[in-house]
């Protein structure tokens, strides 16, 4: 009779059984944890509707504040550029309008959030025992933090607009000085020759003036050959000066409009600051009322504790009441013994 050693097979089967049993237990444990989490979520959804709504609204406001801060940083970079060389007034105006709309929308959302917090506090004042003071304090801290961040962003926006206005005014003064200097320049031969040289280089670089230069050169050659006097160069100079003055006037008008837009935006930001200050004042009044209510509750609790201690002392000193209680207990004990 041949005997085979199957110890290794038995050990392998035992290991495989242990692995299967371990995996089965882990699956059961995961299922139980999922059921417990679902039950806990179902139990807490009814109690935490206002809290979840408050948290969702606060997270949305925080996201809007962060996006507004990014736009404000971009606007600050654009506003610090020199308006004469590298300027983009259209993009600056669009960013200013977008930031202004975002600030107004965030202000309205903060008002709604503060109203939601007020309704939550007023709805739970009757059941102070079931109310969690940590949740109320957390909501209060969240509202105060969002108001502070919004105040900082509004202040930064106002500073950026004031810096932009300062640069615009400086550029406007510079252009006015340049135009007055060019208008009252001395008319000597040296300045005329320098201006003619600059005009020649400008005309050579300008493709629209090449035909005019060719015609003027031909007329100059004909007049020099025939001995006649002609001044087409002076006509072209006058035309170029008129074009330069028109372009300067258009540029100054655009700058004036940009300055007016910035001034109106600064005024609107000031109005938003006033609204934010009123909101902060209302929050301060609400906090003071909550503190007063907490003080009243502390006084009531201390008074109730004193009354309970007095009643306990009175019961302890009343021996006749203790004798009555003892006698009643003894009578019930005797009746119970007799009945049994």
Curated annotation (Swiss-Prot):
GO terms for molecular function: SNAP receptor activity; SNARE binding. Residues 31-51, 180-231 are annotated as: Disordered. One of its GO terms (biological process) is regulation of inclusion body assembly. Residues 1-319 are cytoplasmic. Residues 39-51, 189-209 have a biased composition (Polar residues). Interacts with SLY1, STF1, SFB3 and GOS1. This is Integral membrane protein SED5. It comes from Saccharomyces cerevisiae (strain ATCC 204508 / S288c).
């Amino acid at each position: 009779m041949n005997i085979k050693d199957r110890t290794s097979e038995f050990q392998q089967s035992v290991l495989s059984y242990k692995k299967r049993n371990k995996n089965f237990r882990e699956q059961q444990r995961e299922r139980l944890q999922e059921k417990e989490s679902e039950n806990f979520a179902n139990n807490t959804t009814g109690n935490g509707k206002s809290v979840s709504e408050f948290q969702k609204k606060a997270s949305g406001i925080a996201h809007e504040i962060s996006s507004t801060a990014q736009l404000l940083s971009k606007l600050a970079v654009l506003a610090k550029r020199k308006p004469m060389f590298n300027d983009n007034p259209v993009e600056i105006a669009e960013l200013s309008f977008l930031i202004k709309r975002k600030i107004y929308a965030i202000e309205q959302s903060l008002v709604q959030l503060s109203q939601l917090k007020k309704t939550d506090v007023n709805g739970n004042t009757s059941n102070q025992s079931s109310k969690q003071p940590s949740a109320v304090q957390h909501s209060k801290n969240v509202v105060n933090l969002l108001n502070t961040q919004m105040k900082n962003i509004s202040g930064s926006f106002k500073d950026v607009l004031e810096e932009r206005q300062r640069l615009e005014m400086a550029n406007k003064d510079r252009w006015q000085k340049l135009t007055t200097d060019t208008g009252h320049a001395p008319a000597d031969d040296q300045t005329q020759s320098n201006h003619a040289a600059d005009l020649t280089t400008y005309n050579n670089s300008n493709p629209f003036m090449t035909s005019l230069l060719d015609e003027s050169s031909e007329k100059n050659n004909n007049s020099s050959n025939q001995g006649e006097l002609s001044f087409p160069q002076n006509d072209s100079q006058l035309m170029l000066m008129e074009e330069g003055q028109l372009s300067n006037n258009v540029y100054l008008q655009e700058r004036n409009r940009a300055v007016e837009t910035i001034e109106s935006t600064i005024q609107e930001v000031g109005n938003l600051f006033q609204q934010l200050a009123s909101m902060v004042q209302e929050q301060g009044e609400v906090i003071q009322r909550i503190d007063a209510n907490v003080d009243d509750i502390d006084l009531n609790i201390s008074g109730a504790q004193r009354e309970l201690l007095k009643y306990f002392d009175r019961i302890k000193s009343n021996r006749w009441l203790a004798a009555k209680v003892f006698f009643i207990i003894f009578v019930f004990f005797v009746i119970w013994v007799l009945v049994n």
